[in-house]
């Protein structure tokens, strides 16, 4: 029997609780989901650690949205955030840095890896926008990362199945491939079967309505991209369970 592992991308403490109750082995805690995930606050990490008693806690270290080319000040910020995550009891951290020409920024990654000693490290989906996936794979292995979160350089992991399979074969057990982006209860079995990958990253979110009775929908807290203040996406126990059971029930 294959030993599958399930990581839920959580956007709040509430989502962490649902992920744990649904059977997730690990969560990746993120703020700023519309930007692809940014470093969560001190309080969010502390509370997530408090409620996660059986599920491992990984924290994304990403000071902003946008590209993965970081200034010296941003690198210093990331180093401080890694230390904060460690002090608050995180089991792992998630980050990735690129050069101007789309390669892995090995010198910066070495700094972050040194700061992360003793923690599990995932190289995140910066991998999916790097120039050469094969070269990047070898560099990330040499850096000592534990896993790579990737969609196979496609918009979703399902579309990235060919490269995901190739990467797993190239890695040959030297690093874990974590398939993520668009993974759900409808496609997880196909991705597992066709790639041979055994770790999966998914959000299992649903939209819930605000509890506000008074609403002024003419005013938005965001900029040009309108996101309603009166509904939000949260991980639900049901969707976590459904996604996990869709693959474990087929064993």
UniProtKB/Swiss-Prot annotation:
Coiled-coil annotated residue ranges, if any: none
GO CC terms: cytoplasm
Keywords: Cytoplasm
Molecular-function GO term, any one: copper ion binding
Subcellular location: Cytoplasm
Main location: cytoplasm
One Pfam family per UniProt: CutC
Family: Belongs to the CutC family.
Name of this chain's protein: PF03932 family protein CutC
Source species of the chain: Bacteroides fragilis (strain ATCC 25285 / DSM 2151 / CCUG 4856 / JCM 11019 / LMG 10263 / NCTC 9343 / Onslow / VPI 2553 / EN-2)
Phylogenetic placement of the source organism: Bacteria, Pseudomonadati, Bacteroidota, Bacteroidia, Bacteroidales
Gene from which this protein is expressed: cutC
